[in-house]
């Protein structure tokens, strides 16, 4: 599907926020889009839905390589080729005490989730290396705690330390971010016997479940199996995942 | 206008097929395109027992292509018959089943099991390792190709297609071995063996070290091999490798492929197979060609 870029701006060093027109299906929080980044890239690239309202889609992305670099140079009026929304998204359980945990650009899918989560009480913990971004958009949606590794903004340390402190006060944790963070969320939530859903990343080709390229290892009754991050995920119950 | 072609006993509405392993069992793509429009569907390679496949990463993008190391993840032949075939049977499209054995006996076992209603053809994937011969692919040895083809031919009433690997010195010898073994058709090419290195870790990207290259990067190689094969066999050839649009498809047909298969392009654009069919039709209209068979093998050298 073709989508017209409405805006594309840098919001931190190498982090961009892009909005485009969206006439396709309404996304569910945690779902992602496959975007043709043009230039020399061959496959489409996956990006989470960061926000969505009335035919306007927002993504938040970090420049990593050729594809994201091309994206960062797009301007209002440029046309993107996109498929999606793909994947399962977060399972929303209404009326719970919820903790949303994001690390770095992994906070991308969590804004739309925070808007749709229908919590009884919502805590949001956002962890960054040094520079923070998008925090203001979370303010007002819940009780926000920010961490940076050196303490330049907010609390000093890792976001998972916040989770350790708060785990006793919540019914469910939703997380997205770097693998070590997700692994820590899995450990903390399993130890505390609290529900936890995490959004995983893997290299993708088709994005729809056909190529079996995006495998992630999950626990089975006897041993393990590989599931598809794009179709069976990207969101998994933390206890299923074998890191 | 006639777009239909014949491969063995299979009548295809048009010459556009999906390549094994790039179209799953059709389910995912049925959300994007009308499967009834396709010439045929070749499903993911099956093995006797379910296979988990390789650990990630399994994909790596290269210049104009992808390297994959999926490791033949599949539910096994029984689960396919039970869970996937009924879905495929609900469409009016020939189903061709790709089989990958580790021994000749495994190929025969699967061919017998799949000799059932709802399946039109068997595609023998000889690119998998021959465990009895120390893991070298069956497909590099013409004697093995002949032997498997002959035994599978005896084991099934379906159209037998032998899928050749390009990772050989002389593809013509392999094609002739398949024809001699009784194949109804030959398909080529499978992926080209390749490798990628992570310079930070100084390790291969894939745990398996070697992966299979597909996509536009391999199209010239594929086209040349199809050209070579059509000159030495009289059975139909299904051409594939890097087809991204109707023009690519026409190149293969002009060279002499009776049908073409689209693989990696499905990942980039899930609508591509139908777009290719429409593109071929338009080309025929514009050039006042009544029958697709006028195009096939029409290359002037
Ligand atoms: C479901 C899902 C949702 C995602 N959502 C976002 C998002 O909202 N914002 C965002 O900035 N990024 C997101 N990503 C990661 C993003 O897809 C990659 O950063 C992007 O594909 C890199 O493309 P590139 O061409 O710029 O870099 P490449 O040149 O392809 O790669 C540069 C680096 O990025 C890594 N990379 C490449 N593809 C992926 C991938 N699929 N997942 C993780 N790392 C990858 C490579 O290993 C390499 O280190 C998501 C990934 C997935 C799987
Ligand atoms: C992800 C992936 C999985 C594949 N799996 C199989 C398979 O199971 N059996 C097989 O015979 N070929 C398999 N192939 C090879 C393709 O069917 C095809 O021969 C090859 O990719 C060349 O065509 P393409 O460039 O259009 O993709 C696979 C290719 C890819 C990219
Ligand atoms: S990206 Fe193809 S199966 Fe997930």
Swiss-Prot record, chain B:
GO molecular-function terms, A-Z: dihydroorotate dehydrogenase (NAD+) activity
Localization per record: Cytoplasm
Domain of life, source organism: Bacteria
Cofactor note: Binds 1 FMN per subunit.
Top EC class, one word: oxidoreductase
Cofactor names: FMN
Pathway membership: Pyrimidine metabolism; UMP biosynthesis via de novo pathway; orotate from (S)-dihydroorotate (NAD(+) route): step 1/1
Catalytic activities: (S)-dihydroorotate + NAD(+) = orotate + NADH + H(+)
UniProt: FMN binding residues: 20, 44-45, 98, 125, 163, 189, 215, 241-242, 263-264
Positions of the catalytic residues: 128
Keyword Iron: no
Cellular compartments per GO CC: cytoplasm
Pfam families: DHO_dh
Main localisation: cytoplasm
Disulfide pairings: none
Binding site for substrate: 44, 68-72, 125, 190-191
Matching SUPFAM superfamilies: FMN-linked oxidoreductases (SSF51395)
Any one GO biological process: 'de novo' pyrimidine nucleobase biosynthetic process
The entry's keywords: Cytoplasm, Flavoprotein, FMN, NAD, Oxidoreductase, Pyrimidine biosynthesis
EC number from the UniProt entry: 1.3.1.14
Record's function text: Catalyzes the conversion of dihydroorotate to orotate with NAD(+) as electron acceptor.
PANTHER family per the UniProt record, alphabetical: DIHYDROOROTATE DEHYDROGENASE (FUMARATE) (PTHR48109:SF1), DIHYDROOROTATE DEHYDROGENASE (QUINONE), MITOCHONDRIAL-RELATED (PTHR48109)
Family: Belongs to the dihydroorotate dehydrogenase family. Type 1 subfamily.
Record note on quaternary structure: Heterotetramer of 2 PyrK and 2 PyrD type B subunits.
Name this protein carries in UniProt: Dihydroorotate dehydrogenase B (NAD(+)), catalytic subunit
Organism for this UniProt entry: Caldanaerobacter subterraneus subsp. tengcongensis (strain DSM 15242 / JCM 11007 / NBRC 100824 / MB4)
């Amino acid at each position: 599907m073709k989508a017209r870029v409405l805006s594309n701006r840098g919001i931190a060093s190498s982090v961009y926020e892009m909005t485009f027109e969206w006439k396709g299906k309404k996304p569910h929080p945690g779902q992602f889009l496959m975007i043709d980044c043009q230039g020399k890239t061959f496959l489409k690239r996956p990006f989470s839905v960061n926000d969505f309202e009335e035919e306007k889609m927002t993504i938040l992305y970090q420049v990593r390589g050729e594809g994201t670099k091309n994206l960062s140079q797009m301007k209002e009026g440029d046309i993107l080729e996109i498929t999606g929304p793909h994947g399962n998204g977060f399972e929303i359980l209404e009326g719970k005490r919820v903790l949303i945990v994001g690390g770095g650009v992994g906070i991308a899918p969590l804004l739309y989730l925070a808007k749709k989560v229908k919590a009884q009480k919502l805590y949001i913990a956002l962890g960054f290396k040094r520079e923070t971004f998008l925090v203001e958009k979370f303010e007002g949606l819940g009780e926000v705690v920010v961490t940076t590794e050196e303490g330049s903004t907010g609390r000093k340390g890792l976001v998972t330390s916040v989770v350790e402190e708060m785990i006793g006060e919540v019914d469910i944790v939703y997380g997205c971010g770097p693998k070590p963070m997700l692994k820590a969320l899995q450990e903390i939530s399993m130890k505390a016997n609290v529900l936890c859903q995490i959004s995983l990343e893997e290299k993708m080709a088709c994005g729809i479940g056909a190529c079996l390229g995006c495998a992630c290892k999950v626990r089975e009754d006897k041993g393990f199996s590989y599931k598809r991050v794009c179709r069976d995920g990207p969101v998994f119950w933390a206890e299923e995942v074998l890191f | 206008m006639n777009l239909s072609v014949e491969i063995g006993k299979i009548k295809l509405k048009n010459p556009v097929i999906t390549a094994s392993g790039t179209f799953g069992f059709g389910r995912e793509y049925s959300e994007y395109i009308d499967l009834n429009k396709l010439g045929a569907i070749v499903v993911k390679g099956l093995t006797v027992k379910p296979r988990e496949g390789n650990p990630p990463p399994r994909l790596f993008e290269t210049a104009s292509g992808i390297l994959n190391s999926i490791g033949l993840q599949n539910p096994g032949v029984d689960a396919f018959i039970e869970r996937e075939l009924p879905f495929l049977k609900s469409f009016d499209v020939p189903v061709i089943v790709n089989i990958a054995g580790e021994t000749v006996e495994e190929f025969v076992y699967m061919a017998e099991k799949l000799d059932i209603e709802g399946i039109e053809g068997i595609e023998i994937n000889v690119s998998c390792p021959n465990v009895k011969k120390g893991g070298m692919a069956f497909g590099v040895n013409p004697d093995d190709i002949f032997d498997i083809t002959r035994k599978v031919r005896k084991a099934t009433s379906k159209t037998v297609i032998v899928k050749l690997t390009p990772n050989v010195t002389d593809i013509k010898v392999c094609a002739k071995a398949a024809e001699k073994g009784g194949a109804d058709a030959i398909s080529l090419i499978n992926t080209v063996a390749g490798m990628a290195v992570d310079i930070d870790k100084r390790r291969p990207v894939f745990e398996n070290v070697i992966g299979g290259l597909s996509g536009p990067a391999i199209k010239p190689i594929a086209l040349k091999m199809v050209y070579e094969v059509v000159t030495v066999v009289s059975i139909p050839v299904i051409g594939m490798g890097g087809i991204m649009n109707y023009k690519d498809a026409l190149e293969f047909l002009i060279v002499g492929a009776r049908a073409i298969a689209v693989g990696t392009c499905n990942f980039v654009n899930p609508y591509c197979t139908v777009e290719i069919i429409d593109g071929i039709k338009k080309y025929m209209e514009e050039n006042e060609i009544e029958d697709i068979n006028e195009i096939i093998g029409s290359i002037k050298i």
